[in-house]
Amino acid sequence: MEEKDKEEKVTGENLEPEDKNLEQEDKEEVVGPQEEQQIDEAKNWEEEYNKLLDEHNRLKNQYLRLYADFDNYRKRTQREKEELLKYEGMEFLKKLLPVLDNFERALKEKDTDPQKVIEGVELTHRQLLEILNQHEVKAIEAQGQPFNPELHEALMVEVREDLEENTVIEELVKGYFYKDKVLRPALVKVSKKQ
């Protein structure tokens, strides 16, 4: 009986390593050519995925940089625009300062020589008109013209049989264009028939 037990033990011991070898062989057999191809394809897909992920990250970073650059550009142009609007009249005002200087000179002469005051005022008037002309400010012709509500504002009406109705008789306050827009309408007196 002991021999049988020994044989069984030997046989059992011998079977176990064989079983292990069989399992390994089964595992190796499971990975056949088709499975190897699938594994290779999976590796290729993984490589492709990683490449696409890298490209995605690169493009995302590029987008974020461009977005930040554009945001900085927008902020900078807004600041420049605000500064430009804040100081837009500065050059025009610099041109007006000599006009003010001439007025002050003319006023200094008011007690000594009235003719010098008149000459100073005339000079200042010409200088101011020249500056306005340089900035495309032009007078609106009103006297003798047909009344135009876009250019004139009627303050008074006078009955006149010798003129056509709605003719500007008198310009009370001069009107001006700035480029092609009315800066200020002319204040006028208009004719009316009885």
Swiss-Prot record:
Residue ranges, compositional bias (Basic and acidic residues): 1-24
Transmembrane segments annotated in the record for this chain: none
Region spans: Disordered: 1-41
Keyword Cytoplasm set for record: yes
Any one Gene Ontology cellular component term annotated for this protein: cytoplasm
Source organism, top-level taxon: Bacteria
Entry's Gene Ontology BP terms: protein folding
Keyword vocabulary terms for this entry: Chaperone, Cytoplasm, Stress response
Any GO molecular function: protein homodimerization activity
Protein localization: Cytoplasm
Gene3D superfamilies: 3.90.20.20, Head domain of nucleotide exchange factor GrpE
A UniProt-annotated Pfam family: GrpE
The keyword Amino-acid biosynthesis appears for this protein: no
Primary localization: cytoplasm
Function: Participates actively in the response to hyperosmotic and heat shock by preventing the aggregation of stress-denatured proteins, in association with DnaK and GrpE. It is the nucleotide exchange factor for DnaK and may function as a thermosensor. Unfolded proteins bind initially to DnaJ; upon interaction with the DnaJ-bound protein, DnaK hydrolyzes its bound ATP, resulting in the formation of a stable complex. GrpE releases ADP from DnaK; ATP binding to DnaK triggers the release of the substrate protein, thus completing the reaction cycle.
Known partners and oligomeric status: Homodimer.
Similarity field: Belongs to the GrpE family.
Name of the protein in its database record: Protein GrpE
Annotated organism of origin: Carboxydothermus hydrogenoformans (strain ATCC BAA-161 / DSM 6008 / Z-2901)
Gene: grpE
